[in-house]
Amino acid sequence: KEAPDRVRELEQWGAVFDRTPKNLINQRNFGGHTFPRLAHVGDATGLEIIRTLQERGIHEGIDIFMEYTVRHLLKEGDRVTGCVAYTRVDGDFHAFSAKSVVLATGGITRVWSVCSGSWEYTGDGHALALWAGAELRDMEFVQFHPTGMVWPPSVRGILVTEGVRGEGGRLTNSEGSRFMFDYVPEMFAGDHAETIEEADQWVEEVVSGKLATVRRPPELLTRDVVAKAINSEVKAGRGSPHGGAFLDISHRGEEAILKKLPSMHHQFKELAGVDISKEPMEVGPTAHYVMGGVLVDAETQESTVSGLFACGEVASGLHGANRLGGNSLSDLIVFGKRAGEFAAKRASDLAQPTIDDSQVQTAIQEMLAPFTNEGGENPGIIYDLSLIHISEPTRQHW
């Protein structure tokens, strides 16, 4: 109910969403969706939202502390009263007093060697909440996106947007077969095309701005189904040369691709030397999103610890066990706003808490401990050994 208002608010703040010829916000198809629901900015919607919110933050005069890592949450009794952090540039320590704290730290997918998340997706927010006494739930629910880059090794796992399939991208195996027709679960059988002709007609109707009169291609099944299908094809010996599947959008033509998928065109050209307007991409499953996280109140986003709020991927409860594509951004803009509003409302009734020096010193000692330990493991050696294991043939498949 609130997502449309948040999209309009982003537009008022300067976001530029794609428009239809009738000047309505264009909405794209994603896997698992019954209707085209996704307001988008080409294939870089997230970046546009980040840009817009950063500029808004500067306009509002919000203090932004760049390149800080929070290591410890301060508490007074059962409530959170601030945090201790260090700067990644020079290692200085800083303590912050806060009436309310909002965690918006993202996910945990850097736990996997093949993942789509940034280097910061190391579960810091989940750990901070747990150490502060907050309850976590559903941490076993991790989603693997079906289309990450697979070659060269340096870019393995980088996301290939679902928008490619939403714009008509075709998944094929090494034999040239559109294998997704063989993997439609019984519960989805009536919702997806049974023939290539029907699937292609759906694409023609949708890309021309019409309402589809036929069923959607099986490439737009939910992420778990498509990821498992690609994995099955690879294990059966029908994978691409580097252990994935082929995703082809070249039939849409260069003009349409540069208009609708400019970031993907640039990404493959620069990172893999592949022109997606002329040749297929190689893609495979990549760790993408954790549905589990901090248990929060559905209305306020407050955790089980007073004064500690969470929103986005670090929170839980919104996406069940298998998030649909695009819903993470709706989650962010709706519940991010809610978390901020309720955190501010709570803070307005409280006095500024005093920083507990003993807690700060304990946090600093914990941060410095790895530099003073005698014995233990050398993380550099462990990392090198992990690369050796990953390079073995048995570990090249997901």
PLM region descriptions:
Residues 1-16, 134-137, 142:
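Conserved FAD-binding subdomain of flavin-dependent enzymes
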Residues 6-92, 104, 148-152, 157:
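Conserved redox-cofactor binding core of oxidoreductases
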Residues 9, 15-39, 76-78, 172-192, ...:
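Glycine- and aromatic-enriched mobile tails/lids
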Residues 71-80, 84-86, 259-315:
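A glycine-rich dinucleotide-binding beta-alpha-beta segment and adjacent secondary-structure elements
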Residues 91-100, 304:
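Core beta-strand elements of the Rossmann-like FAD/NAD(P) dinucleotide-binding domain
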Residues 100-158, 322-342:
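Glycine-rich loop(s) and the adjacent beta-strand/alpha-helix scaffold that form part
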Residues 135-270, 274, 342-348:
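An anion/pyrophosphate-binding glycine-rich loop and adjacent beta-alpha core
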